[in-house]
Amino acid sequence: MSWWQVIVLAAAQGLTEFLPVSSSGHLAIVSRIFFSGDAGASFTAVSQLGTEAAVVIYFARDIVRILSAWLHGLVVKAHRNTDYRLGWYVIIGTIPICILGLFFKDDIRSGVRNLWVVVTALVVFSGVIALAEYVGRQSRHIERLTWRDAVVVGIAQTLALVPGVSRSGSTISAGLFLGLDRELAARFGFLLAIPAVFASGLFSLPDAFHPVTEGMSATGPQLLVATLIAFVLGLTAVAWLLRFLVRHNMYWFVGYRVLVGTGMLVLLATGTVAAT
């Protein structure tokens, strides 16, 4: 993998990780169009450490507050407030993707990274996001969050294992279907992603240097630079998205997904771009 490839792919990762447009899908598309290869699940997972570091810093106060409340609540029942429950909800919601990620690791690295799968998921899931935005009442705030919500959003997060779906797209959509307000759905989804993505990135670190089923590999310095680029752009992206969702809906992203997905389907159908 050249330095130019590293910079472009890391930029794509950082800019799209928190937007409901699928960062892994964009990495697959960009690497196939411009570099005639696949960045691979391992490079994606490791570069995600940069964007997840960004979300940790952005939500640092929330994380410290929730963790403190959770630890205190374990000892003193009187301290079991909303933040204490939120700590448990993050744990509960993380379990589904951890289990499926381990069981379907090989499938994620091979078959589901076919561009036909990626762009089809990009287009089809646009309909899910649009429907969630249309039917979501957005009447429930954080005080009314329950463990059932955590389970549903956690299961929705597993859909992000398929490139083209989008982690934030699936979790925000699930939250909207449950009646959560848009900003809460986004914030809870980001908190839910932190432990799962960090675990995935660390687990995939060795394979990023010596991929078994992927053609593009990176050196240690390249992975470091990719992580730093993804961190800076990811921090900018998460701050922008949360401000955007306060005043705007998800239809903007639906339109973008349909446009990119349809264009890619045409390129694939005409043989301009190879699916694998």
Swiss-Prot record:
Q: Which residues cross the membrane?
A: 84-104, 115-135, 188-208, 222-242, 250-270
- Sorted alphabetically, which InterPro entries does this protein's record hold? UppP
Q: Which GO terms describe its molecular function?
A: undecaprenyl-diphosphatase activity
Q: Per its UniProt entry, what is the enzyme's top EC class, as one word?
A: hydrolase
GO CC annotations on file: plasma membrane
The protein's UniProt keywords, in alphabetical order, are: Antibiotic resistance, Cell membrane, Cell shape, Cell wall biogenesis/degradation, Hydrolase, Membrane, Peptidoglycan synthesis, Transmembrane, Transmembrane helix
For this protein, what is the EC number?
3.6.1.27
Coarsely, its chief localization is membrane
Reaction equation(s) it catalyzes: di-trans,octa-cis-undecaprenyl diphosphate + H2O = di-trans,octa-cis-undecaprenyl phosphate + phosphate + H(+)
Q: Where in the cell is it found?
A: Cell membrane
Q: Which HAMAP family match?
A: Undec_diphosphatase
What other note does the entry give for this protein?
A: Bacitracin is thought to be involved in the inhibition of peptidoglycan synthesis by sequestering undecaprenyl diphosphate, thereby reducing the pool of lipid carrier available.
Q: What does this protein do?
A: Catalyzes the dephosphorylation of undecaprenyl diphosphate (UPP). Confers resistance to bacitracin.
Protein family (similarity comment): Belongs to the UppP family.
**What is the name listed in the Swiss-Prot or TrEMBL entry for this protein?**
Undecaprenyl-diphosphatase
The gene it comes from is uppP
